[in-house]
Amino acid sequence: MTFQRPLYIPFAGPALLESPLLNKGSAFSQEERNNFNLTGLLPHNIETIESQSTRAYQQLSSFKSDLDKHIYLRNIQDTNETLFHHLIENHLEEVMPLIYTPTVGLACEQFSKIYRRKRGLFVSYPERHKIDDMLQNATKQNVKVIVVTDGERILGLGDQGIGGMGIPIGKLALYTACGGISPAYCLPIVLDVGTNNSQLLADPMYMGWRNPRITGEEYNEFVDLFIQAVKRRWPEVLLQFEDFAQTNATPLLNKYRDQICCFNDDIQGTAAVSVGTLIAACQNKGEKLSDQRIAFLGSGSAGCGIAQHIVRQMQREGLTQEQARQRVFMVDRYGLLTDQMTNLQAFQQPLIQYTKDLSHWDISSHIGLEQVIKQGNISVLFGVSGQPGLFTQEVVESLCANVDHPIVLPLSNPTSRVEATPKDITTWSHGQAIVATGSPFPPTLYENEYIEVSQCNNSYIFPGIGLGVLAARATAISDNMLMAASQALADASMQYEKVKGALLPPLGEIRPISKSIAYAVAKQAIADGLALPVSEETMQRRLVDNFWAPKYRTYRRTSF
């Protein structure tokens, strides 16, 4: 057991109890109560964190709605972060959907109505000349991980304005719960650039800047002001872009990925976990990913990010880039992306199919999903459309006509946006389809047997990436580091005995998996020249040192 030195604390009395990072509540020892002027401010009995956590779980269980449970958990987080994470650690699979998807979507929609206490930074456009001051005002000084959103594309719910702050808060809770990154190092930020959500603009309770969103040069200049201020304040920070609209997501990532250590979880994290899951699914079939022919319904930044990651994996398995791209088909509401289409976005261009290569297809001018599945002999289908019900029975039956065990990945979230439910896919495929989803679903009952549904959840990936970056002290995140994360996840999934249908280990095992991913990411950072070389022993020690556990430390009073 690692020895922890006492913490020397300058706060006392009510100020100490008001600090979420330091508050122990009823677990302050008698000596600490005497030394920190807490006598009489707490009930007499001195409790352990285990007994506190038991009470908190009983209270949590008494709430009926998931939103009420989310609000309760956030209240604990804002009063005692150590207890909050102890509770999560002991009930991870049950609590994760409450602090993140799908419940966080409703919390974002209701943000201004359920707001109780400040957390993170609200960087608003009208106060853009004070960004340096805002960063200085952060209650956390040694920030190592920032998650930032502008609230424009929150899950599948669209523009939520500053309500999008719920996403960085939830995401950083998972960095700690799954990746062991201390909450003292984590800072959620929302860029308040207005909102085009008419309901929010008309809502007297809305707490953000009541103005239509700024766009174009105004927007880009504001984001740049923010990025440069972050670089001045915390030059070695890991910055995660979260839930930006696709018109901004890829350009911002491309612009800043060589200026600051950053990544976009919607594009790169989703891609990494999706490819890791797909590799695991192919291994279950005794096949390689490069054997597959893959269709995407949805060609936004997330879908294209996954597709590009798949192309890179196929190249690692021996295909040329051209061969790999010919096996990936992107479909949106206008049909298959081809060289005949105009007004495609820059990130879509590398993934088009050339009509000369489709000359043998029996097609009309509009090439829809079913035609792509039939003519393209598709074996894997991704759903990243954000539109429910688009994977119909006919679509699934067409897949089954191509291969015995098609892989179907409806990844849109929250649950209300999924392209098809696992139950329907299993029924329509007569139990033959291999399924993973983006949101949590219960096991599917088919022919008196329960089939587990793996959640292709970014939480399997981004905490490990973050931990690996911190341990390696990497200056950037390369595509190779993301590929290493995907392979590490697939390898980890093969090491666990899984129930029928499961492609990934249980989420309850995510902390050791994050350590494995972190080590792979750190090694690749060194190989790519993005971190200084260190011995394996040193890297393992850094991973241990950076892996925070929710335990109370002994406090000593700072002397002046």
Swiss-Prot record:
Gene3D superfamilies, alphabetized: Malic enzyme, N-terminal domain, NAD(P)-binding Rossmann-like Domain
Alphabetized HAMAP family for the sequence: NAD_malic_enz (MF_01619)
Species in which this protein is naturally found: Psychromonas ingrahamii (strain DSM 17664 / CCUG 51855 / 37)
UniProt record, GO biological process: malate metabolic process
Record's GO cellular component terms: cytosol
Residues annotated to bind NAD(+): 153, 266, 413
Keywords (A to Z) from UniProt: Metal-binding, NAD, Oxidoreductase
Entry EC number(s): 1.1.1.38
Reaction(s) this enzyme catalyzes, per UniProt: (S)-malate + NAD(+) = pyruvate + CO2 + NADH; oxaloacetate + H(+) = pyruvate + CO2
Subunit structure: Homotetramer.
Essential cofactor(s): Mg(2+); Mn(2+)
Name of the protein: NAD-dependent malic enzyme
